[in-house]
Every structure is written in structure tokens, then in C-alpha cells.
Amino acid sequence: MIQQETRLHVADNTGAKELLAIRVLGGSKRRYAGIGDVIVASVKDAIPGGSVKKGDVVKAVVVRTVKEHRRVDGSYIKFDENAAVILGSGREPKGTRIFGPVGRELRDKRFMKIVSLAPEVI
């Protein structure tokens, strides 16, 4: 459950290390984002020489949340950290690698490139 001002780890190799959520996309009154939702975020920490710099405003998709997410079959999924993948043009990831597991909800929301790059889909 991601909301405004939430800090997230970055799960790709774009060079960013930490994001700060600015807005949850999808409606004017939308408050929370879960796995597979797109947010607008600011890069708060980045490594030198990366494709994104500190202070850049980017779109990102949430791939892991600490708050449990209920699935249709009644099971719950939760992770140890909040993490996101930075998006480039369209719904494609800006980086070429994804680190750590991602939720199966990304497949339902048609982020196929992220699902194929991820080492594990839970």
C-alpha cells in the first residue's frame, strides 16, 4: 500500500536507489497504490553515471509492498520492502535488469517485459 510521500527501493539497474512517491495514477481521488499500479515519483538517491539522476521525476510501477495483498483465490502475498521499477516510454521498463522477486499481479496488468526480466515471479 503505497501513498504520497512513501519511499521505495528501486528494483532495476537504471542507477536510482530510492524513490519518493508523488502521486498515484488512476483517478483524482486515488489514495493508495498496490502491486502493479503506476505512480509518479522523484528520485531521491542515485549512483553516479546512471540513466536517471537525483531530482528526476519519473513514472514507476510498484512490484513489491510490505502491506499484504489479497488475491482472488484467498491467499495473501507480502514482501520485506516496498520496491518499484522505473518506466520509460509507454509501459516498458527503463532498465535492462530487474532485481528480486515481483508479484504475479504484474502479469494480469500486462507488464510482460518486467515479468520476463524478473528472476522470480511470486
Swiss-Prot record:
Any Pfam family the entry gives: Ribosomal_L14
GO molecular function: large ribosomal subunit rRNA binding; structural constituent of ribosome
Keywords recorded for this protein, A-Z: Ribonucleoprotein, Ribosomal protein, RNA-binding, rRNA-binding
Disulfide-linked positions: none
PROSITE patterns: RIBOSOMAL_L14 (PS00049)
GO CC list: cytosolic large ribosomal subunit
One GO BP: translation
InterPro entries: Ribosomal_uL14 (IPR000218), Ribosomal_uL14_bac-type (IPR005745), Ribosomal_uL14_CS (IPR019972), Ribosomal_uL14_sf (IPR036853)
TM annotation in the entry: none
Functional description taken from the UniProt entry: Binds to 23S rRNA. Forms part of two intersubunit bridges in the 70S ribosome.
Similarity section: Belongs to the universal ribosomal protein uL14 family.
Binding partners and assembly: Part of the 50S ribosomal subunit. Forms a cluster with proteins L3 and L19. In the 70S ribosome, L14 and L19 interact and together make contacts with the 16S rRNA in bridges B5 and B8.
Protein name from the UniProt record: Large ribosomal subunit protein uL14
Organism listed in the record: Bifidobacterium adolescentis (strain ATCC 15703 / DSM 20083 / NCTC 11814 / E194a)
Name of the coding gene: rplN
